[in-house]
A protein has these predicted regions:
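A domain-start/cap signature at the N-terminus of enzymes
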Residues: 2-47, 110, 116, 135, ...
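Serine-hydrolase catalytic machinery in alpha/beta-hydrolase-like enzymes
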Residues: 17-32, 42-126
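Alpha/beta-hydrolase fold active-site loops
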Residues: 43-46, 156, 178-179
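Primarily recognizes the serine-hydrolase "nucleophile elbow" in alpha/beta-hydrolase
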Residues: 63, 120-126, 130-177
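Short beta-strand/loop motif that positions the catalytic acidic residue
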Residues: 181-184
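Acidic catalytic loop of the alpha/beta-hydrolase fold
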Residues: 186-192, 219
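Histidine-bearing beta->alpha loop at or near hydrolase active sites
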Residues: 213-219
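Post-His helix in hydrolase/transferase enzymes
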Residues: 221-231
């Protein structure tokens, strides 16, 4: 990755499949990266960290229809970690969870992978430290809740989509300053968990938006509502105040 920043002109507008040496796991680890054509190393660029769902991969979430197109349109760099493997849960279900050939500390390694990839990206690119966003689908949505609450000083806003939400909503008390957009289909079995977390955000008077999509399932909501997701992210920087960088159009109500 040391030469990645120097080669940026050749890699702009492309989704790259990269690897790094995951020392804690003792193996190379894949991640995916999208660099917008507008990227200029002299200017600070917003970053989205994207967490894939159970059984999926870093490259798969980057291929969600419209994801990189919206990143290109709005000038975001996007990075998607593996989370150790396709079932690591990013630490949202504890430090263990390994079975079969998985390491016993699978959850710990899954979380560490995300933070390593974030660190590598911040090192290689001129990232706007006030505009680092975290989003994820399904298992990745659960990871978004977990990592949002564990590292609350990093994120400008969160975007859990059809999240496999942890049981403990008290985690929200550590991140009341972070704006959150939740996108959830009402035909998805996970809708009850999403409603529970949204109710807790209301109770805590958190800045949030909840899009419950009528007729929406578990998968289709993940790629049909990028306009609302990016509009929300555009509206906030880490200061927790509406950002004047871009005035978003209000998201349509479901």
């Amino acid at each position: 990755n040391s030469s990645l920043a120097q080669e940026t002109d050749q890699t702009k507008g492309k989704t790259l499949s990269l690897t790094y040496d995951f020392k804690e796991a003792g193996k190379p680890m894949k991640y995916s990266l999208y660099i917008p054509t507008s990227y200029d190393k002299q200017k600070k660029t917003p970053l989205i960290v994207a967490l894939h769902g159970l059984g999926s991969s870093a490259s798969a979430i980057m291929r969600y229809p419209g994801f990189t197109r919206h990143a290109e349109k709005h000038g975001y760099l996007v990075v998607a970690p593996t989370g150790y493997n396709s079932r690591g849960w990013y630490g949202s279900r504890g430090t263990g969870g390994g079975r079969g050939s998985d390491p016993e500390n699978l959850g710990e390694l899954s979380e560490k992978d995300v933070m390593n990839v974030l660190g590598i990206t911040r090192l290689n690119f001129n990232i706007d430290e006030n505009r680092i966003y975290l989003m994820g689908h399904s298992m990745g949505g659960g990871g978004t809740w977990h990592l949002g609450s564990k590292y609350p000083d990093i994120w400008a806003a969160l975007g859990p989509i059809a999240p496999a939400a942890p049981r403990d909503t008290s985690r929200l008390e550590k991140m009341t300053h972070i704006p959150v957009i939740v996108i959830q289909g009402d035909k998805d079995g996970l809708v009850r968990g999403a409603r529970r977390w949204v109710a807790k955000m209301k109770e805590l008077k958190m800045e949030h938006e909840y899009l419950e999509i009528e007729g929406g399932g578990h998968v289709d909501v993940a790629f049909k509502h990028f306009p609302e997701l990016f509009a929300f992210f555009n509206a906030y920087s880490k200061a927790g105040q509406k950002d004047a960088a871009e005035t978003p159009t209000p998201a349509p109500k479901p």
